[in-house]
From Swiss-Prot:
It is a peripheral membrane protein. PROSITE patterns: ATPASE_ALPHA_BETA. This is ATP synthase subunit alpha. One of its GO terms (cellular component) is plasma membrane. It comes from the Bacteria. It is an enzyme of class 7 (translocase). It comes from Pseudothermotoga lettingae (strain ATCC BAA-301 / DSM 14385 / NBRC 107922 / TMO) (Thermotoga lettingae). It is found in: Cell inner membrane.
């Protein structure tokens, strides 16, 4: 087969016409120092704050954290043992994003959205930037829908609404995580998607939490984001923002979400470590000057959106650990001032067997009251007054024999109500069951019982209501208030039960 010179010429001319000169211009820099999860990079003159960069030789990504005159401080989001001085770093010209959506429900992932549960890759269709601006005032509406925790003391006296930020604060081992996990378990069937962010915790502790969530069927609507104690500080630093982005996906799609940050004390410590390594000037307790902004920009993203924005909500339950009950330390006071109230847990109550160890006097919910259902308001108002009076008189309880009958009656009522507020872990109650039990307490039906029989009464009374009076519970659940007719029926039910009940 012979090819004529004319054909060869034509092919060459066509190829020359098709040729496009492509120049791939990339801005790169070089590593001048590496260690402790931090790289100093020379070059990258146009890099933006918080922009993603890539270490070409290893494929590890990092965040441009410190922009200085002659170098860029990069925090590394992966293993850095293979990175050497002189390695090339290139800009990616984008902000860090994480996978979001319903595909993450039931999964345990790291803050980059990579699976940690061995169940295969996460097939998410959407991603979101981990740092975005919080919704403005104009796009929000007041908190007016309850988020039931299933815990009597909280739902009655420190109610939480959808879109609220409620801090859980207390010393280590006082049951802070237990309250958050019970709240997640209680969202079953309520259409609330949950994100649990574990920051700086032991991997074994997180594994136990995941097992419990699976046991109670809560992983169906929950994503667990883990930045464990063994993860580098940069991963712990981005964890809450990644969890928030996953929750925001549901909020901006007209759904309700709950995100738990466990805990922000360790998050602040990780940020302090990064800041000190990058030689940022230290302030109080060696934290950098923008530590308040670190948490405020995270927690401000929790909101209840107005109908024009879809009406979704993101509720935040940040957890902060105190040292020796010191609520006036730097991070606790910061987060208290950012949030809409706090649930304060006290070691003294915890060790005396009062669990959940909530100090009702120091705990407050600044906006949740308007979200409480009317039936609970009718019961909780009296409960709050009775407990406040009891706390005033408690010191006199040891002289009970010398007190007048009215004071003695108040002390007895308070002791019974305190016993009634005790609750086992992993046993959240539906709101209608809480209402009937607390109604029996505040109306004095338990005053004649020995204090030690109160828990037994509660268990057996609820069994009786579920089996014989389920229609009444359903009515309270639907009407959400104690009408005269419902109240009469409830009084009759309590009296009937007490007549046939044996301590």
């Amino acid at each position: 087969m012979r090819i004529s010179p004319g054909e060869i010429t034509k092919v060459l001319e066509d190829r020359i016409k098709e040729f496009k000169e492509e120049i791939d211009l990339q801005e790169t820099g070089r590593v001048v120092q590496i260690g402790d999860g931090i790289a100093r990079v020379y070059g990258l003159n146009s890099v933006m704050a918080d922009e993603l960069v890539e270490f070409v030789e290893t494929g590890v990504k990092g965040l441009a954290f410190n922009l200085e005159e002659d170098n860029v401080g990069v925090i590394l989001l992966g293993p850095y043992s293979q990175i050497k001085e002189g390695h090339i770093v290139k800009r990616l010209k984008k902000i860090i994003e994480v996978p979001v959506g319903e595909e993450l429900l039931g999964r345990v992932v790291n803050p980059l959205g990579e699976p940690l549960d061995g169940l295969g890759p996460v097939e998410a269709k959407h991603t979101r930037k981990i740092e975005i601006k919080a919704p403005g005032v104009i796009y929000r509406r007041p908190v007016n829908t309850p988020l039931q925790t299933g815990i009597k003391a909280i739902d009655a006296m420190i109610p939480i609404g959808r879109g609220q930020r409620e801090l859980i604060i207390g010393d280590r081992q006082t049951g802070k995580t237990a309250i958050a996990i019970d709240t997640i378990i209680n969202q079953k069937g309520k259409g609330v998607y949950c994100i649990y962010v574990a920051i700086g915790q032991k991997t074994a502790a997180v594994a136990r939490i995941v097992d419990k969530l699976r046991e109670f069927g809560a992983m169906e609507y929950t994503t667990v984001v883990v930045a464990s104690a063994s993860d580098p500080a940069p991963i712990q630093y981005i964890a809450p923002y990644a969890g928030c982005a996953m929750g925001e996906y549901f909020m901006y799609n007209s759904k309700d979400a709950l995100v738990v940050y466990d805990d922000l004390s360790k998050h602040a410590a990780a940020y302090r470590q990064l800041s000190l390594l990058l030689r940022r000037p230290p302030g109080r307790e060696a934290y950098p000057g923008d530590i308040f902004y670190l948490h405020s920009r995270l927690l401000e993203r929790a909101a209840r959106l107005d109908d024009k924005m879809g009406g979704g909500s993101l509720t935040a339950l940040p957890i902060v650990e105190t040292q020796a009950n010191d609520v006036s330390a730097y991070i606790p006071t910061n987060v208290i001032s950012i949030t809409d109230g706090q649930i304060y847990l006290e070691p003294g109550l915890f060790y005396s067997g009062f669990r959940p160890a909530i100090n009702v006097g120091l705990s407050v919910s600044r906006v949740g009251g308007s979200a409480q259902i009317r039936a609970m308001k009718q019961v909780a108002g009296m409960l709050r007054i009775d407990l406040a009076q009891f706390r005033e008189l408690e010191t006199f309880a040891q002289f009970a024999s010398e007190l007048d009958p009215a004071t003695r009656a108040q002390i007895v009522r308070g002791q019974h109500l305190q016993e009634l507020l005790k609750q086992d872990q992993y046993s959240p109650l539906p709101v209608e069951e809480q209402v009937v039990v607390l109604y029996a307490g505040v109306r004095g039906y338990l005053d004649e019982l020995p204090v030690e029989s109160v828990r037994k009464f509660e268990k057996e009374f609820l069994d009786y209501m579920r089996t014989s009076k389920s229609s009444l519970l359903k009515l309270i659940s639907e009407k959400k208030e104690l009408t005269q007719e419902v109240e009469d029926e409830l009084k009759k039910s309590i009296q009937e039960f007490l007549e046939g009940w044996h301590e």
